Amino acid sequence: VRLRLKIDYAVCEKLCVPAEGRAELTLAPGNSVHNADLSAAEARVPKQVTAAQAGLTARRVTTGAKPQVAVDLAAPPGQPIELFVEGPTPKWALPIPKPAKPASNGQAQFSFDLDGMPPGVDAKSPVDLTFTVVTGDRAVEVKSRLD
């Protein structure tokens, strides 16, 4: 079995620079020296859960100059937490959510500008977003509709 990976992505600050990565791995049938590595990598793949299971809620906030999204989610005590967001298609380039305030009482709050949408998309229209929550060695993926 030959595994091939090609990934197109962008590194963004003020300007997005496209990049590409490729990797290939050939696996022989049966046990392999790579089994442990593959199992470890598979364990790190985000597991899909519901918004309720992740304790995640997302809502629009329109008090500032730009529309923002505020995200509340369950946060295990004593563990760092990261949040990433994707739009419904690869044409979306949403910013990385930033912590709105330090996690406390089992809750974390993040926010991000509703920016990086494809041309012609209304920032006020409903949209399906995918959130990836990373805490320690665990990652989950949550699909949520922003009305």
Where are these regions (language model features)?
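Structural recognition of alpha-helix starts/caps
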Residues: V1-D147
